[in-house]
Swiss-Prot record:
MF GO annotations: mRNA regulatory element binding translation repressor activity
Species: Drosophila melanogaster
Phosphothreonine: residues bearing it: 412
Compositionally biased spans, kind Basic and acidic residues: 206-227, 388-403, 1067-1115, 1408-1417
Protein name (database record): GIGYF family protein Gyf
Documented effect of changing residue 60 to A: In C; impairs interaction with eIF4EHP but has no effect on translational repression or induction of mRNA decay
Stretch list, region Important for promoting translational repression: 1-640
InterPro entries referenced in this protein's UniProt entry, alphabetically: GRB10-interact_GYF (IPR051640), GYF (IPR003169), GYF-like_dom_sf (IPR035445)
GO CC term (a single one): eukaryotic translation initiation factor 4F complex
Gene: Gyf
Consequence when changing residue 596 to A: In GYF; impairs interaction with Patr-1 but has no effect on translational repression or induction of mRNA decay, and does not affect interaction with me31B or Not1
Length: 1574
C-alpha cells in the first residue's frame, strides 16, 4: 500500500546504511523528517538508524512535518559518513526562516523597482507569487524548492512581476549541484528559457513537478518502470501514452487509453490519483486534470506569451493553455481520465496549495481533503459540477462563448439559479460547452479554459475561503429566489459577445511583457454579487473576490475601445515640461502606483488646454478619466467650460469607491440597484460619521485648543481619520485571519506583514482619499451634514483669518494644505449659495482667504520659508496656465455680486483662490497698465464733485499721511539694504502711483554714495532726468486740477458779488448772505493758512535738502580725504605710482563734483511750483535723516576706520618683515653681498691681472733659472712653500668664490662650496685665464706686498688647475714650472713640456737667453689657444647660468638663486638634484622640467669643462684613484686614441690607470721634504 510513497529525490531514497545498498532498496524510513517534503534536506533525522530500511507506516502533511521539526535535535552519526551528501550547516525549514533583505532583493524586477507600499499586488489570501524564492540561493547548500504552498510563507508579489520572462538570477540545475541525473534529463532541463529549479519551475515549490511550464525529467519523480528503478525520459516531445510510461502511468504495452491511475499497488485504497475507468478518455476529465495542476501564482499565469502547442492525444490534440511556444513539457495529465475521486486522493505534497485543504493523512495512509465535504459529486465519467459555486456557474458558459459565440444564444445560463434546475441538464450544458475545446487551438479557447480550470482549482484547494463563498453564494441564491427574479442578470453569452471585439484591441495595447488574458472575472462583471451584511463584511468579501484576480494581469480592460486620439494623454511635469503622449493604460498604472496626484495637469490628445486631474475626475463623477474618457465632455464642450468649473452633481447616486477599473458598462438590474442602494446607505453612514468627526474636532478647537489654522486642523484631523480607518481595517482583517490555523502559527511579525499587505490591497474609499473627495461624497450622500460641516469650517476660518500660515511648518505635506484650503473655499461657497447672501459673504470670503493686509505683503522677507515655497509653486502654476487674473484690476473687497468673479461656478479657479489668499508676488502679476487711468479718473471725480480746494487738500493730506506712515515703517525696517528699498518701492507702486517717484528720488539721493565711475554717473543722471520728467508731468496734471478748482472758486465769488448788488428782499436773503460771507471768510482764512503752510513747507523742505546736501558733501569730503591719503601713500612709494595717484585723485574729484551735482538736481526738483498737497509727502521724503540713515553712516565710518587701521597694520607688518629679512641677511654673511665699493669693471680687472701675472711669471722663471744654476736645493724649498700656500689659498678662495660670484647674478658661475673657482666665470672678454675669484680677492684689499706675491702664486696655480672633482683619474701631472700651459685645447702642449723637461735635465747646456725666448714664445701660443677655449666655455657658462636664473625667476622660487644653482652644481647624483628641486621648488610640472633640463645642461657644461681641464693636476689634492669610473675610462679612452694619433708617442702612460712619472714638484704621501742647506 505504501511502497509508492517515495518522498524526496532518488539519491536520498537510495541512501542506505548498508555497505551494499542497491538502488531498488528504498531507504526512506522516517527520513521524511529528514527532508522537508520534496527535497528540502534539513540535515537532522529524528528516527533511529535501525528503522531506516522500513517503509513508512504513516504519512504526514506539510504542517504536521513543520510541527514535528525540532531545532535541538542532534545529527545522526551516520549522516556525516556520506561526504557528498552531508551538509554541515543545518538548514531549517524555509517556512520557519524569516525573510532577509537579500531574499527580498532576489524577487523579480517589478517588485524591486518600487517600494512595498506602492505595490498594488493583486494577490489574494491564497496567492503564491514569490518571484525567485529564498530556497533558490546557492549559498543555502543544495538548491531547495520555493515555498509556494501557502501565502503565509511567501513574499508578496506585485503587479509587475515577470519571474518567467525575466529570470532574475541564474540557478544551477539539480544535476550540477548534486551530481545526479542523466544526460537526457539535463538536456531536457536546459531546453527551456535558462537555468531552472530542480523540477523545472523557477518560482515554484519542488512539489510542483507537474506544473504548467518549464517541466523536465530531471526531478526525483522521473519516469520509472513498475519496480521503481526508473525507465528514463521520453524520447520525443510527444505526449502520447507510451512515451509517458512511468510509475504513475500504468502503461505497460503502450496503451494510449490507459490513465495514470491503473497501478493499484501504488496508492492503497485508490488505484491512482485519478481513480476512474481507464477506458474512458473524455475532454472534460482532461481539462479537469490540466486545471488541477494549474497554479495560482502570478509568476506563471502572468507571463504566458504565445499560444499553446497542441499535444498529441489518442484521437486528436488539445491546446494547452500554459505551454510556452519555446518549450514542450511532458504532461502527466494528458492521458488521464479523471473520475469521481479525482480530487480526493491527490496527495498533499503533490498539490499546489495543500494548506488550503486543511486535510491530512489518516492512519491507513489515505489522504482526506476538502472534497470529502463536497455536497455534490458527479458520477463515473462526468465532470463534477458545483452548483453552489457562483464563479464556475459564470465561467463555464463564458468559456463556451469564447470558443463558439454563435452557440451562446441557445444556452440558458446557470446564473438564473432557479430551484427546478436539473443537475443533469447542467452537466450536459457544461459538456457541450467544453466539447469544442478538444478540437480547436484558438486563443479564445485558451483564455476560457484557463479561467475555468483555475477557478475550479481555486475552489477545490482553498477550503476556508470557499466556505465563505458557498455561504455568500447560497445567500445570494436565496435572495434572488425569494424575490422571484429569475434570469434577471444579463446573459453572460451576450457579455462575452461584447467582449470579443475588444480582444484584438487589447492584444495591440498590452505590452510585450504582459500576457494577453481578456477573460473578465466575476468580480469584473458583477461586483455587487455578494449580499451586503455589514461594511466590514463587504470589505472582507471584496478582498476575497480579489483573491481570484492574480490569475490575470492588471490590464485595465473595462473601457476597451480601439485606440484613438482620446486614448492618448499628455501631462505637464513640475518642471513645466510636457510629457507624452501616453496611453490610458500607462497613465492608469502610474496613477495607481502613486506617481500622480490630483494636482497633475493633464489633457487628451484632442484637447487644447491642460486641466488638473482632480477636475477631470469630478467630470467623470469620481471615476478615473483615463479609463472612462467616454464620460468626459467632448473637446469642444470642454473648451467652453472654464477651468475649475464642473457640471452640477448628478441627482442619481454615484459610486464613491477608490479608483479602480470599473466593470464593463451594462444595464443594472433591479436586484443590483437594491444592492447599490444598500451599499450607498452604508457608505452614507460612514461619510456622515466622518463629517461629524471633523465638525466635532473643529468645534472643539473653539474652546482654546485651536491649532491656529483651519487648514492645518482639517489636515491633521483628516489624516487621523485615515489612520483610524486603516487601523479599523487591520483589526477586521486580523479577526478574519485569526480563524485560520495556519495564520495562528505565524509569528507576530509575519502576522503583521500579512495583515498590512491585505490592507494595502483595500485602499481608502474616496471620502477618505482627500477632503475634496469628502466634499463630493457629502454633496451626493448627505448634503445636510455637508452644510453643517461647511458652517463650522467657515466659522473657524473667520476666527483665525489673521493666522493662515502660522503653522505651515507643522503640516505634513503641501498637497494636504492645498487640499484643505480648497475645501475651506468650497465650504464658504457652499454656505454662500445656501444662504443666498452674496455680498457680505463674498467680502468675508475675500477677507478670510486674503489672510493678511497689504502691509503684510510689504514684508516678503518675513514670510516663512514654507510659505515662500507655496507662493512659488502657485506662481509657477499660474504662469504655466497662461491665464492669470490680476488682483490690481479688482478692488480689494468684492462689493458686487458673486457672479462678478464666480460666473455660475461651484468652485473657484486657482487664480481667484490666489487672489483671496494674497499669495501671488507682484512680479508674477501682469503690469498695472491702468494705474495712471485710475489716478486720472480719481482726480476727475474729485474735480467734478462740488468740493472746495481745502477739502481736496485735506483728502490728499490724509492720504499722504497714511502713505507716509507706511513708508516710514517700511524704510526703518528695511533701510539697511538698498535692494529691499527697491522691493518696497515696487510694492508701494501697486497701491499708489505717486509714491514711486518720491521713493525713487530718495533712493537716488543715496545711490551716488554707492555708484562709482563715469558710466554709472551717466546712468544715474538719465534716471534722474526721467524721474524728474515724470514728476513734472504729474505736477502739471496736479496744477491743472488746481486751476480748475480755482476757476470754480472764482466763479462762486463772482456769483456772490453779483448777488450782493441785488436788493435784499427779505431777511432770509440777508441771513443767507451773511452765512455765505462768513463761509467765504473762513475759506479765505483757510486759504491763507494753506499758503502759509505751503511757504513753511517750502522753507522746511529747502532747509532739509540743504542739510542733507551738506551732510553728503561732508561725507564726500571725508571720503576724498581718505582717498587722497591712500593715494599719497602710494605716491610715496614711487614716482610712477604717484602719477597714477594724482590721476586717481583728479578722477575722484570729478566724481565728487558729479555726485554733488546730482543731489542739487534732485534738491531743485521740489522747489518748482507744485500743488500744495504734494509737499506733505515731499517733506516726509526730505525729512531729517532718520535713525536708520544715521546708523548706516556710522557703519560706513566704522568700516572706513577699520580699513585705515588694517592698512596701518599691513604697513607695519611689511616693515617688520623687511627688518627681519635684513637681520637674517646680516646673520648669513656668507651669502650676503659685500658692501658696495668703487670697483673696476671685470674686463679691466682681468686685463690688469693678466698683465701682472705674465710679468710675474716671466720674472719668476728668470729668477728660478738663475737660482737653479746657482743652488739646486733652493728650488725645492721654493716648491715646498708654493705648495703649502696653494693648499690654504685654494680653501680661502673657495670660500670667497661664492661671495665674489654673487656680485653679479647674470655672470655667476655657480661654483660649489669646496670646488675650485671656475676660470671661465663671468669672463666676457676672455682675454686671460684668471678667474673672477682673483678679482674678488684683489678687490678685498688690505694685502701687503708679500701677501700679493703669495696670492699671485696661488692664482697662477688655481686658475690653471682643475678642481679635484673634474680631474681625471688617469691624467698625468704636468710640470709645475709651466702650469699655465695645461689647458683643455692644447694638443701641442706635450712637445712644449717635453722640451722644457729636456732643458731642465740638461741644466746649463742651454743658455738662459734661449730659454727666456722659448718661454715667451710658449706663453704667447698658450695665451692664444687658452683665450679661444676660455671664450667658448665662457659663452656656454654664461648661457647656462642665465638660463638657471631665468627659470627660477619664472617659477617664483623662494630660494637664493645663485646659491641654489651653485649647490645643485655640486651634486653628482642626478636623483639628488631632483630630490632637492622637489624639496625646494615643489612637485609641479615646472620643477620637474627644470630638474631635467638642468641635468642636461650641466652635463654639457661639465663635458666642456672637463675637456678644457683634461690635463690639469692639482698639487693641493691627493692623487686620483687607481681605478677610474666607467664614464671617465670611456672618455679617457677616446681622448687617448685621439692624442696617440696626434702625438705619435711610443706609449700613453694613462692606459695603466696611474701616473708613471710624477711631477717634479710632487710630494707623495709619507715622503718628507728635506731642504738642503747652502
Amino acid at each position: 500500500m505504501t511502497d509508492s510513497m517515495k518522498f524526496g529525490p532518488e539519491w536520498l531514497r537510495n541512501m542506505s546504511a548498508e555497505p551494499s545498498g542497491s538502488p531498488s532498496t528504498y531507504n526512506v524510513g522516517n527520513a521524511a523528517q529528514n527532508n522537508s517534503i520534496g527535497g528540502h534536506n534539513l540535515g537532522n533525522n529524528t528516527a533511529a538508524s535501525a528503522s531506516r530500511n522500513l517503509f513508512p507506516e504513516y504519512r504526514y502533511g506539510r504542517e504536521e512535518m513543520l510541527s514535528l521539526f525540532d531545532r535541538n535535535c542532534l545529527l545522526p552519526q551516520i549522516l556525516p559518513s556520506f561526504k557528498k551528501l552531508f551538509v554541515e550547516k543545518v538548514q531549517c525549514p524555509l517556512a520557519l526562516t524569516p525573510s532577509s533583505e537579500e531574499d527580498i532583493n532576489q524577487n523579480s524586477l517589478g517588485n524591486n523597482s518600487r517600494p512595498a507600499w506602492l505595490q498594488r499586488s493583486p494577490s489574494g489570501f491564497g496567492s503564491a507569487s514569490r518571484g525567485s524564492g529564498r530556497g533558490g540561493t546557492v549559498d543555502r547548500g543544495r538548491m531547495r524548492g520555493k515555498s509556494a504552498y501557502h501565502p503565509i510563507y511567501q513574499r508578496p508579489s506585485g503587479l509587475y512581476d515577470e519571474s518567467l520572462s525575466v529570470i532574475s538570477k541564474a540557478e544551477r540545475t539539480w544535476s550540477d549541484r548534486n551530481g545526479t541525473g542523466d544526460s537526457a534529463a539535463t538536456t531536457t532541463s536546459t531546453s527551456g528559457s535558462g537555468a531552472l529549479d530542480w523540477n523545472g519551475t523557477p518560482s515554484s515549490s519542488p512539489r510542483k513537478d507537474y506544473s504548467n511550464n518549464h517541466r523536465n525529467l530531471e526531478n526525483w519523480r522521473r519516469t520509472r518502470n513498475e519496480d521503481g528503478s526508473g525507465d528514463g525520459p521520453s524520447s520525443s516531445g510527444s505526449m502520447s501514452g507510451p512515451d509517458i510510461a512511468g510509475w504513475r502511468s500504468g502503461v505497460v504495452g503502450g496503451s494510449t487509453n490507459a490513465g495514470f491511475g491503473t497501478n493499484s499497488h501504488r496508492w492503497g485504497r485508490s488505484t491512482s490519483w485519478r481513480d476512474e475507468d481507464p477506458s474512458v478518455d473524455n475532454a472534460a476529465s482532461l481539462q479537469r486534470s490540466i486545471s488541477t495542476v494549474a497554479t495560482l501564482s502570478t509568476d506563471r499565469t502572468g507571463n504566458n506569451k504565445g499560444s499553446g502547442i497542441g499535444a498529441a492525444e489518442g484521437v486528436g490534440s488539445i491546446s494547452h493553455p500554459r505551454l510556452s511556444s519555446s518549450k514542450i513539457s511532458q504532461l502527466w495529465t494528458v492521458n488521464n481520465a479523471a473520475g469521481v475521486d479525482a480530487d480526493e486522493n491527490l496527495p498533499e505534497w503533490a498539490i499546489e496549495n495543500p494548506s488550503k485543504l486543511g486535510g491530512s493523512f489518516d492512519a491507513s495512509g489515505a489522504f482526506h481533503g476538502d472534497t470529502d465535504l463536497k455536497p455534490i459529486k458527479s458520477s463515473h465519467n462526468t465532470l463534477k459540477t458545483k452548483s453552489l459555486d457562483s464563479y464556475d456557474d459564470v465561467k463555464r458558459p463564458k468559456s463556451k462563448d469564447l470558443s463558439d459565440p454563435d452557440s451562446g444564444n441557445d444556452i440558458t445560463p446557470e446564473t438564473s439559479l432557479t430551484k427546478d434546475t436539473n443537475t443533469t441538464a447542467v452537466q450536459e450544458e457544461v459538456e457541450s460547452s467544453l466539447s469544442p475545446i478538444s478540437s480547436t487551438t484558438t486563443k479564445e479557447v485558451i483564455h476560457g479554459d484557463i479561467s475555468d480550470r483555475i477557478k475550479e482549482v481555486a475552489d477545490e484547494v482553498e477550503k476556508l475561503i470557499m466556505d465563505d463563498d458557498h455561504k455568500i453564494s447560497s445567500n445570494q441564491s436565496q435572495h434572488q429566489n425569494h424575490d422571484g427574479f429569475t434570469a434577471a442578470l444579463p446573459r453572460m453569452a451576450d457579455i462575452e459577445i461584447n467582449v470579443k471585439p475588444s480582444v484584438t484591441a487589447v492584444h495591440r495595447q498590452a505590452p510585450s511583457t504582459m500576457p494577453i488574458q481578456i477573460t473578465p472575472t466575476i468580480t469584473d462583471v458583477a461586483p455587487p454579487s455578494h449580499a451586503v451584511v455589514s461594511f466590514s463584511d463587504h470589505e472582507t468579501m471584496q478582498h476575497h473576490n480579489m483573491h481570484h484576480l492574480p490569475q490575470f494581469p492588471m490590464i485595465p480592460t473595462p473601457h476597451i475601445i480601439t485606440p484613438n486620439l482620446n486614448e492618448l494623454w499628455f501631462y505637464r511635469d513640475p518642471q513645466a515640461n510636457v510629457q507624452g503622449p501616453f496611453s490610458a493604460v500607462e497613465m492608469t498604472e502610474w496613477y495607481r502606483a502613486g506617481y500622480f496626484n490630483e494636482n497633475l495637469f493633464v489633457r487628451r490628445y484632442s484637447d487644447n488646454r491642460f486641466r488638473p486631474l482632480g477636475e477631470l475626475i469630478k467630470f467623470c463623477h469620481g471615476n478615473m478619466p483615463f479609463t472612462h474618457s467616454h464620460l468626459l465632455p467632448s473637446p469642444i464642450e470642454l473648451e467652453n467650460i472654464p477651468v475649475g468649473q464642473i457640471p452640477a452633481p448628478l441627482t442619481a447616486s454615484l459610486s464613491i469607491t477608490p479608483h479602480k477599473p470599473s466593470p464593463i458598462p451594462i444595464a443594472l438590474s433591479v436586484v443590483e440597484q437594491q444592492l447599490q442602494q444598500q451599499r450607498d446607505e452604508q457608505l452614507k453612514a460612514n461619510v456622515t460619521a466622518t463629517a461629524e468627526a471633523l465638525r466635532a474636532a473643529i468645534k472643539g478647537s473653539f474652546g482654546g485648543n485651536s491649532i491656529g489654522n483651519t487648514s492645518h486642523l482639517l489636515t491633521m484631523r483628516f489624516q487621523m481619520l485615515q489612520d483610524q480607518y486603516i487601523q479599523h481595517q487591520e483589526y477586521q482583517i486580523l479577526a478574519e485571519l485569526s480563524k485560520n490555523e495556519c495564520f495562528q502559527r505565524l509569528s507576530a511579525v509575519e502576522q503583521e506583514t500579512v495583515v498590512r499587505r491585505k490592507v494595502q490591497l483595500l485602499g481608502l474609499p474616496e471620502y477618505l482619499i482627500s477632503l475634496n473627495g469628502l466634499s463630493n461624497s457629502l454633496s451626493v450622500l448627505n448634503p445636510v451634514a455637508g452644510r453643517q460641516l461647511y458652517r463650522a469650517v467657515v466659522e473657524h476660518a473667520k476666527k483665525d483669518q489673521q493666522h493662515i500660515f502660522a503653522n505651515t511648518e507643522q503640516q505634513r505635506s503641501v498637497g494636504n494644505l492645498l487640499d484643505a484650503n480648497n475645501f475651506i473655499l468650497n465650504a464658504q461657497i457652499m454656505i454662500q449659495q445656501s444662504q443666498q447672501e452674496v455680498g457680505p459673504l463674498v467680502s468675508s470670503v475675500d477677507c478670510i482667504m486674503q489672510g493678511g493686509t497689504a502691509a503684510d505683503l510689504n514684508k516678503p522677507n518675513e514670510i516663512p520659508r514654507n510659505e515662500l515655497d507655496l507662493i512659488n509653486e502657485y506662481n509657477l502654476r499660474m504662469l504655466l496656465r497662461g491665464q492669470p487674473t490680476s488682483t490690481q484690476q479688482q478692488p480689494p473687497a468684492l462689493t458686487n455680486s458673486a457672479t462678478e468673479n464666480l460666473p455660475g461656478v461651484d468652485f473657484l479657479t486657482e487664480t481667484q483662490l490666489l487672489e483671496r489668499q494674497n499669495l501671488m508676488i507682484p512680479i508674477w502679476l501682469p503690469p498695472n497698465n491702468n494705474k495712471q487711468q485710475e489716478t486720472d479718473q480719481q482726480w476727475a471725480e474729485m474735480s467734478n464733485a462740488d468740493a472746495s480746494l481745502w477739502e481736496t487738500a485735506n483728502l490728499n493730506e490724509e492720504r499722504n499721511e497714511d502713505q507716509q506712515l507706511l513708508i516710514q515703517k517700511s524704510s526703518e525696517a528695511c533701510f539697511a539694504d538698498t535692494e529691499k528699498d527697491v522691493k518696497i518701492a515696487q510694492l508701494f507702486q501697486v497701491q499708489s502711483g505717486n509714491v514711486v517717484n518720491h521713493t525713487a528720488l530718495e533712493e537716488l539721493d543715496q545711490s551716488p554714495q554707492n555708484l562709482k565711475g563715469s558710466h554709472n554717473q551717466k546712468i544715474v543722471k538719465s534716471l534722474v532726468s526721467d524721474i524728474q520728467q515724470n514728476h513734472n508731468e504729474e505736477l502739471n496734471s496736479h496744477q491743472h486740477q488746481v486751476k480748475q478748482a480755482n476757476k470754480q472758486n472764482l466763479n462762486t465769488k463772482q456769483n456772490a458779488a453779483q448777488s450782493a448788488l441785488k436788493p435784499i428782499n427779505n431777511e432770509n436773503d440777508r441771513k443767507r448772505e451773511q452765512t455765505e460771507e462768513k463761509k467765504r471768510q473762513r475759506e479765505e482764512r483757510k486759504r491763507q493758512q494753506l499758503e502759509d503752510d505751503k511757504r513753511r513747507a517750502l522753507n522746511e523742505s529747502e532747509e532739509q535738502t540743504r542739510q542733507i546736501q551738506e551732510e553728503k558733501e561732508r561725507q564726500q569730503q571725508i571720503q576724498a580725504q581718505r582717498r587722497k591719503a591712500l593715494l599719497g601713500n602710494v605716491h610715496s612709494l614711487s614716482v610712477q605710482n604717484g602719477m597714477s595717484g594724482t590721476l586717481a585723485s583728479a578722477q575722484s574729484k570729478k566724481n565728487d563734483d558729479a555726485k554733488t551735482a546730482e543731489p542739487q538736481v534732485s534738491s531743485r526738483l521740489p522747489s518748482t511750483s507744485v500743488a500744495p498737497w504734494s509737499f506733505q509727502l515731499q517733506n516726509s521724503m526730505r525729512s531729517a535723516p532718520g535713525l536708520a540713515e544715521i546708523q548706516k553712516a556710522e557703519r560706513r565710518e566704522r568700516r572706513a576706520d577699520q580699513q585705515r587701521h588694517q592698512e596701518l597694520l599691513d604697513k607695519q607688518l611689511r616693515a617688520n618683515a623687511a627688518a627681519a629679512a635684513e637681520a637674517n641677511d646680516a646673520l648669513l654673511k656668507w651669502q650676503s653681498t659685500p658692501a658696495s665699493a668703487p670697483v673696476m669693471s671685470l674686463a679691466e680687472i682681468q686685463a690688469e691681472e693678466a698683465r701682472r701675472l705674465a710679468n710675474d711669471l716671466v720674472d719668476r722663471q728668470r729668477r728660478r733659472e738663475l737660482e737653479h744654476h746657482q743652488q739646486a736645493p733652493l728650488s725645492s724649498a721654493v716648491l715646498v712653500t708654493s705648495a703649502t700656500s696653494n693648499i690654504w689659498g685654494n680653501a680661502n678662495k673657495a670660500w670667497s668664490s661664492s661671495a665674489a660670484q654673487s656680485l653679479s647674478l647674470k655672470t655667476s658661475s655657480g661654483t660649489g662650496l669646496w670646488d675650485e673657482p671656475n676660470p671661465l666665470g663671468s669672463n666676457g672678454s676672455g682675454t686671460s685665464g684668471t678667474s673672477s675669484v682673483t678679482a674678488a680677492a684683489v678687490l678685498a684689499g688690505g694685502l701687503n706686498s708679500a701677501n700679493k706675491s703669495t696670492l699671485q702664486a696661488q692664482n697662477k696655480s688655481s686658475a690653471l688647475f682643475a678642481s679635484p672633482r673634474n680631474l681625471r683619474k688617469s691624467q698625468t701631472l704636468p710640470a709645475l714650472s709651466n702650469p699655465e700651459k695645461s689647458n683643455k685645447n692644447g694638443p701641442g702642449q706635450r712637445p712644449e713640456k717635453q722640451k722644457l723637461a729636456q732643458t731642465r735635465s740638461k741644466g746649463a747646456a742651454v743658455s738662459i737667453e734661449e730659454k727666456d725666448r722659448e718661454r715667451k714664445l710658449n706663453a704667447k701660443s698658450q695665451q692664444s689657444s687658452t683665450d679661444q677655449a676660455i671664450s667658448k666655455v665662457n659663452e656656454y657658462e654664461n648661457e647656462f647660468t642665465s638660463w638657471c636664473i631665468k627659470s627660477l625667476d619664472n617659477m617664483s622660487a623662494k630660494v637664493d638663486v645663485p646659491t641654489f644653482v651653485a649647490f645643485l652644481q655640486d651634486l653628482e647624483a642626478p636623483y639628488e638634484v631632483k630630490d632637492y628641486v622637489r624639496i625646494y621648488l615643489g612637485d609641479g610640472k615646472d620643477s620637474l622640467d627644470f630638474a631635467k633640463q638642468f641635468l642636461e645642461r650641466r652635463s654639457k657644461y661639465k663635458s666642456l669643462q672637463r675637456a678644457q681641464k683634461a690635463h690639469n693636476d692639482d698639487m693641493c689634492k691627493p692623487a686620483p684613484a687607481i681605478t677610474p669610473s666607467a664614464n671617465d675610462y670611456a672618455d679617457s679612452k677616446n681622448k687617448q686614441k685621439k692624442i696617440k694619433k696626434n702625438k705619435m708617442t711610443k706609449m700613453d702612460a694613462r692606459i695603466l690607470g696611474f701616473s708613471v712619472t710624477a711631477a717634479e714638484g710632487r710630494i707623495n704621501v709619507g715622503i718628507r721634504d728635506y731642504v738642503e742647506g747652502p
